[in-house]
């Protein structure tokens, strides 16, 4: 008697069970906040305030953009004044003496590290961090 190889297709259940046993990667949740600064500053000045990250920072001075490599993804600071060009925003910025606005984008899994970075920046530059709907 010859040995026959089982040529039957695996059942859909078997394939699904195998997939569910594999490690599932978490879905990235990118967050955006805004850093409102009451003084003129540049992205290079901000980078200098983060000595522990000097080897993890990339700067694009012409775009006023800084990218920091964190544990799960990157944290990006990007000048965002044009996001707040309407007169209501401008009145708010004038009343609160806001001179510079950066959009901050990061992975939710890096939130604790982001809080430490923002705390360091705020200690030197003051200002506040908020979501877009919290600004006015």
What are these regions (language model features)?
Residues 35-36:
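Sequence/structural signature of long amphipathic alpha-helices
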Residues 16-18, 26, 125:
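Intrinsic structural disorder/low-complexity segments
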Residues 26-32:
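His-enriched metal-coordination microenvironments in redox/metal-binding proteins
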Residues 134-136:
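Short acidic DE-rich linear segments
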Residues 1-22:
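Intrinsically disordered, Lys/Arg-rich low-complexity segments
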Residues 26, 39-109:
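Short, intrinsically disordered low-complexity segments
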């Amino acid at each position: 008697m010859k040995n026959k190889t089982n040529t039957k297709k695996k059942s859909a259940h078997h394939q699904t069970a195998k997939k569910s046993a594999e490690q599932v990667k978490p879905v990235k949740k990118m967050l955006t906040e805004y850093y409102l600064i009451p003084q003129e500053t540049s992205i290079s000045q901000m980078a200098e305030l983060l000595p522990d990250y000097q080897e993890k920072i990339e700067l694009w001075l012409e775009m006023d953009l800084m990218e920091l490599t964190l544990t799960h993804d990157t944290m990006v600071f990007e000048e965002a004044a044009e996001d707040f060009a309407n007169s209501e925003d401008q009145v708010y910025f004038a009343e609160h003496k806001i001179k510079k606005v950066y959009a901050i984008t990061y992975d939710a899994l890096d939130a604790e590290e982001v809080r430490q970075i923002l705390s360091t920046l705020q200690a030197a530059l003051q200002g506040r961090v908020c979501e877009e709907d919290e600004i006015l």
